[in-house]
Design a protein with these regions (language model features):
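C-terminal motif of bacterial Sec signal peptides marking the signal peptidase cleavage site
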Residues: 14-17
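Surface-exposed amphipathic alpha-helical segments
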Residues: 123-146, 175, 288-319
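Start-of-domain marker
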Residues: 20-108, 124
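Sec-dependent signal peptide recognition
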Residues: 2-9
Length: 319
């Protein structure tokens, strides 16, 4: 597992560092949409439209469209995320996944999957290579979202974060509402239909490092304590808390530092509000810093709203 995380961390740097060719046309497509070329029996499509974890309703990791090699014309070549499947039992002796950047347009990633047979392709994508494919496309799309954020930032809120916590974080331009507490800052676009929120808070010491196998329970308890004090409903008896479902945890290395990622669902005690959250946890100057995104969008799909904010979390830099 560490091997795959290392690959994805490397790809994040590589994809962000490559310069686009200004002579190429601009790519298109909705966020987290992928075009699959030459898919047989929808094998790649099934690997990509696996449910994204920790959402309140079923939503796929990617919205997938599929075309044949013959139908892959000049217009479709402008898609931002392309997966090309090549099956040939004499030419390929195993399943291999490779990628190129900005082949037909920019920004763009074109992933090639070469396999000797439908059976070998299916077996590979049901295992680690399916996970690798999703992570590769997810990180490429997050990098695209980060590039969009760079030109539409709220520098006033970024300055407030830097002053309060000593970190650099890119903040979406529409995050105009804020509330500050003790070692706590809440930013929001305050939308009535799709409210996107960023929360930054500091925990004294390194409680997760000491928690061992109980790290998820420890984080949930600490998170609930912070949210109960800082994010309340109409009365003091109403406050944000973590939904009592398994919270997903993942550890990776980002910029040579350990990053712990928690995903789960939140709700307001005593109210009908809730949605997904994702928290990035790092050690910072002897303490623990949590940078979290959460979404409230009743009646709407949540994936892209959360992914947009998750891209912002990856811009965090320590001073």
């Amino acid at each position: 597992m560490k091997f795959y995380h290392a690959i994805i961390s490397f790809l994040a740097v590589f994809l962000a560092a490559c310069n686009s060719n200004p002579l190429q046309p601009h790519s298109g497509g909705r966020l987290f949409e992928a075009l699959v070329v030459g898919d047989t029996n929808n094998i790649v499509g099934k690997a990509l439209d696996t449910d994204m974890i920790a959402l309140p309703q079923s939503e796929p990791c990617f919205d997938v469209s599929s075309v044949s090699h013959k139908a892959f014309n000049n217009t479709l070549q402008l898609s931002r995320n392309i997966v090309v499947v090549n099956l040939n039992h004499t030419r390929y002796h195993g399943v291999k996944i490779t990628y190129e950047k900005d082949v037909y347009a920019h920004p763009q990633i074109v992933v090639s999957i070469n396999a000797p047979s439908v059976t070998s392709l299916s077996q590979a994508l049901n295992g680690h290579q399916g996970q690798l494919l999703r992570q590769l496309l997810e990180r490429s799309e997050l990098n695209f979202t980060i590039s969009q954020l760079r030109n539409k930032r709220n520098t006033r809120q970024e300055a407030a974060i830097k002053k309060a916590f000593g970190i650099i974080l890119q903040v979406p331009v529409d995050m105009t509402s804020s509330r500050q507490g003790r070692n706590f800052l809440w930013l929001s676009n305050n939308s009535a239909t799709a409210m996107q929120n960023l929360v930054i808070y500091k925990l004294k010491g390194k409680p997760l490092q000491q928690a061992g196998k109980n790290m998820t329970d420890t984080f949930t308890s600490l998170r609930d304590s912070v949210m109960k004090s800082n994010i309340k409903g109409e009365t003091n008896a109403m406050y944000m808390q973590t939904v009592a479902l398994p919270v997903n945890v993942n550890m990776i290395h980002e910029r040579n530092k350990k990053l712990i990622i928690f995903r789960g669902l939140w709700e307001v005690k005593g109210d009908a509000m809730g949605g997904p959250f994702v928290s990035h946890v790092i050690e910072h100057k002897g303490n623990t810093l949590v940078v979290e995104a959460f979404v409230f969008a009743p009646g709407k799909k949540k994936r892209n709203y959360l992914r947009q904010l998750e891209a912002a979390l990856y811009t965090l830099k320590q001073q």
